[in-house]
């Protein structure tokens, strides 16, 4: 099978590597342009570009896949199938309809739930108990195409975004190869129309999403923290110092302190009163410093019960 692969983020890497290791031919790879990242604003290639260059695959990077030049380049590769995994742009109909087997997509949710750019993070914020992978035919909509195959997994209450995304990325690669192999064998793939009445949208994570609101229930804050671990991190302020919290634990007791108040501190951790219940902070990062267990943080940061979190002024 002659394939063009379109992807950008780390989530796409297992699928691309699985195709490289298979007997299928990768005619070309399409990815987003390099971007400035990190505190030093260093120009960094996309993860998919790095793999494409490592295996000496033909590569197209474009900020706009809809330009005549981009479309022409893809058609010159003469793909029989286009595979899209975490690419990041809406693909025009002129590309979607070009390959004789169409375009298929690996999506990190059980569609039609969590259509959009941040399905894993939004699902974790919602405290979902199960998630999964959908392989689908692509159309012009946002994750609205017919479903070929789905597989679900249980989601632990403490798993974070990075951990769950890796599991789903590996699962997606396995399911993708199954689908491509079925195509090669001449099998007609199923097409299950999505029920739009059951759809939900997973919008990109915003700056506002990163802010911890201590008036929320402890479980909701815990879900936000794990949804934003490892990036970008959920944050608050302690005595005017910005801190990101990467791991937490919901305590069983309700608590009777003031919302956002530190109600207990020991050498290993500290506990905060929320709008409903108590949250224990397990891993934290002071601005400009490395992530560390709360026990290490408290060795160099004085914190007493009664301090209120959330104020920039301290």
Swiss-Prot record:
Source species: Syntrophomonas wolfei subsp. wolfei (strain DSM 2245B / Goettingen)
Gene Ontology CC, one term: cytosol
Entry's Gene Ontology molecular function annotations: methionyl-tRNA formyltransferase activity
SUPFAM superfamilies linked to this entry: FMT C-terminal domain-like, Formyltransferase
Keywords from the named record: Protein biosynthesis, Transferase
Sequence positions that bind (6S)-5,6,7,8-tetrahydrofolate: 109-112
EC number: 2.1.2.9
Enzyme class label: transferase
Database matches in InterPro entries: Fmt, Formyl_trans_C, Formyl_transf_N, Formyl_transf_N_sf, Formyl_transferase-like_C_sf, GART_AS, Met-tRNA-FMT_C, Met-tRNA-FMT_N
Gene: fmt
The protein, known as: Methionyl-tRNA formyltransferase
A family per Pfam: Formyl_trans_N
Family: Belongs to the Fmt family.
Lineage: Bacteria, Bacillati, Bacillota, Clostridia, Eubacteriales
Job description of the protein: Attaches a formyl group to the free amino group of methionyl-tRNA(fMet). The formyl group appears to play a dual role in the initiator identity of N-formylmethionyl-tRNA by promoting its recognition by IF2 and preventing the misappropriation of this tRNA by the elongation apparatus.
Catalysed reaction equations from the record: L-methionyl-tRNA(fMet) + (6R)-10-formyltetrahydrofolate = N-formyl-L-methionyl-tRNA(fMet) + (6S)-5,6,7,8-tetrahydrofolate + H(+)
């Amino acid at each position: 099978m002659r394939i063009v692969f379109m992807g950008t983020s780390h989530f796409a890497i297992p699928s691309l590597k699985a195709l490289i290791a298979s007997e299928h031919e990768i005619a070309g790879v399409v990815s987003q342009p390099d971007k400035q990242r990190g505190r030093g604003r260093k120009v960094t290639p996309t993860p998919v570009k790095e793999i494409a260059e490592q295996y000496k695959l033909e590569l197209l990077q474009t900020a706009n896949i809809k330009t005549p030049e981009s479309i022409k380049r893809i058609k010159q590769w003469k793909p029989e199938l286009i595979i899209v995994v975490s690419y990041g742009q809406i693909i025009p109909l002129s590309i979607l309809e070009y390959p004789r087997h169409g375009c298929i997509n690996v999506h990190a949710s059980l569609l039609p739930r969590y259509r959009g750019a941040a399905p894993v993070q939004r699902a974790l914020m919602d405290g979902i108990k199960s998630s999964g992978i959908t392989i689908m035919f692509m159309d012009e909509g946002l994750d609205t195409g017919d479903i070929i195959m789905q597989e679900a997994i249980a989601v632990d209450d403490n798993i974070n975004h990075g951990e769950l995304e890796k599991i789903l990325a590996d699962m997606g690669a396995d399911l993708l190869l199954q689908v491509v192999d079925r195509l090669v064998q001449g099998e007609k793939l199923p097409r299950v129309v999505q029920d739009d009445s059951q759809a939900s949208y997973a919008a990109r994570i915003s700056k506002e999403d990163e802010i911890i609101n201590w008036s929320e229930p402890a479980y909701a804050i815990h879900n936000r923290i794990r949804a934003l671990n490892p990036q970008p991190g959920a944050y608050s302020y302690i005595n005017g110092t910005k801190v990101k919290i990467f791991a937490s634990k919901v305590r069983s007791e309700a608590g009777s302190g003031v919302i956002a108040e530190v109600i207990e501190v020991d050498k290993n951790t500290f506990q905060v009163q929320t709008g409903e219940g108590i949250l224990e902070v397990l891993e934290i990062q002071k601005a400009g410093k490395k992530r560390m267990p709360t026990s290490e943080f408290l060795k160099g940061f004085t914190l007493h019960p009664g301090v209120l979190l959330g104020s920039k002024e301290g």
